[in-house]
């Protein structure tokens, strides 16, 4: 297919009223990516040189999302009136008129669309078809338009209400997705009339129009997941489950161990190397890369972070955006790391917050250590040198530097830099008063008794 040019027209103008949301339907997410983003990726993977998004409801929000996505060529067209699918496709007339070998028509609410089925439809065009319609076989075909075939040709798409008793027995159904030969696309769609009860222009009419002109029209079969759109929150959750199950399997087959795969939740761009172990109940947000041989313990939450080879994270750890856990470093239980580099072999084992910081190679951060990075207006950096030892329950008030090999005594609050190999105390000297504990206890007990008696 490399020598055939292709335009994908993505219909994303639907109202999406059944989602009951102020957010446009196509911007609801599967695996951390907007549904229309999945469709754009599928079209690009199927060889589309250019994308034309037709937007309507929430046009500015959809436009803002689409413009952030990478594409060799991406155009956005607004469908001002909702007059049917053929009318929607013609909103992208400018893009179609540039002259592509293949034109794909897909929907922005089909997040599970597999690039392979689009490639299969394009292959039909390469073999001489003018139109290739994507069909599927649902367990119960009720409600779907039927694909009527005769001697290997698709002769009509019949809505169920218009089907004969014999046609209702057909289980091959219309998904709405089409591939159209570019040289015929505009001519065919321009002939669609709105002579129906709703007064709309239906793209499916081009099947019969093409047949009347003696052009070859065929059907290409896809799995149900690729063919079904999302209309409400329940279907969104079902699609999420299907997507997650598929992605988990791909990771396991690539050499990643998921101890309880059904409890691990991934994002569209999650990267995990072989020989990494993921324990139960781990959540990956967008922007995560885990190298080979890492170990992510249970109940960890990771987003926009990098974990390098041999590092361990968790249990109950949170890596926020900008966290870098380098080779053989350790992030232990109930730790939060944000915009910080934990260098090779460094340890943050328990109950710590490390934000806007660098922790040098081999450094050890005691339990309860906090980098105080925010003064109410700005974030400030904490630098902890290689091999430094930070005692438990210490507060490092940024901006501050702890030199390589330095020791910080437990319970310290440090506001000044500590030189390399120095020992720093940032707490008041302990004072002990013999017998005063009993005096205080007796006094407080007497006051309590007076209040109780009153």
From Swiss-Prot:
It is found in: Cytoplasm. One of its GO terms (molecular function) is UDP-N-acetylglucosamine diphosphorylase activity. Coiled coil: none annotated. UDP-N-acetyl-alpha-D-glucosamine binds at residues 11-14, 25, 79, 84-85, 145, 159, 174, 231, 320, 338, 353, 364. It catalyses: alpha-D-glucosamine 1-phosphate + acetyl-CoA = N-acetyl-alpha-D-glucosamine 1-phosphate + CoA + H(+); N-acetyl-alpha-D-glucosamine 1-phosphate + UTP + H(+) = UDP-N-acetyl-alpha-D-glucosamine + diphosphate. InterPro entries: Bifunctional_GlmU, GlmU-like, GlmU_C_LbH, Hexapep, Hexapep_transf_CS, MobA-like_NTP_Trfase, Nucleotide-diphossugar_trans, Trimer_LpxA-like_sf. It comes from the Bacteria. Its cofactor is Mg(2+). Residues 1-233 are annotated as: Pyrophosphorylase. Mg(2+) binds at residues 109, 231. The active site is at 350 (proton acceptor). It is an enzyme of class 2 (transferase). This is Bifunctional protein GlmU. It comes from Chelativorans sp. (strain BNC1). The lineage of its organism: Bacteria, Pseudomonadati, Pseudomonadota, Alphaproteobacteria, Hyphomicrobiales. The gene is glmU.
């Amino acid at each position: 297919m490399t020598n055939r040019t292709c335009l994908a027209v993505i219909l994303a103008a639907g109202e999406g009223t059944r989602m009951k949301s102020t957010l446009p339907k196509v911007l609801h997410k599967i695996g951390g990516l907007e549904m229309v983003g999945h469709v754009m990726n599928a079209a690009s993977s199927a060889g589309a040189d250019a994308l034309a998004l037709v937007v309507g409801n929430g046009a500015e929000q959809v436009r803002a999302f689409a413009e952030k996505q990478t594409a060799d060529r991406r155009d956005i067209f607004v469908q001002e009136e909702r007059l049917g699918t053929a009318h929607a496709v013609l909103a992208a007339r400018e893009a179609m008129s540039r002259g592509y070998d293949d034109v794909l028509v897909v929907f922005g609410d089909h997040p599970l669309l597999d690039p392979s089925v689009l490639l299969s439809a394009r292959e039909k065009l390469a073999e001489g078809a003018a139109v290739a319609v994507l069909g599927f076989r649902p367990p119960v075909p009720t409600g779907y338009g039927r694909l009527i075939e005769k001697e290997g040709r698709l002769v009509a798409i019949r809505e169920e209400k218009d089907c004969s008793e014999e046609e209702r027995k057909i289980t091959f159904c219309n998904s709405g997705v089409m591939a159209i030969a570019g040289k015929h696309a505009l001519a065919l769609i321009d002939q669609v009339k709105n002579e129906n009860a709703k007064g709309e222009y239906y793209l499916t009419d081009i099947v019969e129009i093409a047949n009347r002109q003696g052009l070859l029209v065929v059907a290409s079969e896809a799995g149900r997941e690729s063919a079904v759109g999302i209309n409400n929150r329940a279907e969104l959750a079902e699609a999420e489950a299907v997507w997650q199950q598929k992605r988990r399997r791909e990771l396991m087959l690539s050499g990643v161990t998921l101890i309880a795969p059904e409890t691990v939740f991934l994002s569209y761009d999650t990267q995990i190397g072989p020989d990494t172990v993921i324990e139960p109940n781990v959540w990956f947000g967008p922007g995560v890369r885990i190298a080979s041989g890492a170990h992510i313990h249970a109940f960890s939450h990771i987003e926009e972070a990098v974990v390098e080879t041999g590092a361990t994270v968790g249990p109950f750890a949170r890596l926020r955006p900008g966290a870098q856990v380098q080779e053989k470093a350790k992030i232990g239980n109930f730790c939060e790391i944000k915009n910080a580099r934990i260098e090779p072999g460094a340890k943050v084992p328990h109950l710590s917050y490390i934000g806007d910081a660098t922790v040098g190679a081999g450094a050890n951060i005691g339990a309860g250590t906090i980098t105080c990075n925010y003064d109410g207006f700005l974030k400030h950096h904490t630098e902890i040198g290689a091999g430094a030892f930070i005692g438990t329950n210490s507060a490092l008030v940024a901006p501050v530097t702890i030199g390589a090999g330095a020791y910080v005594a437990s319970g310290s609050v440090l506001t000044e830099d500590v030189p390399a190999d120095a020992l720093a105390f940032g707490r008041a000297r302990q004072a002990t008063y013999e017998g005063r504990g009993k005096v205080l206890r007796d006094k407080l007990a007497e006051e309590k008794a007076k209040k109780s008696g009153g």
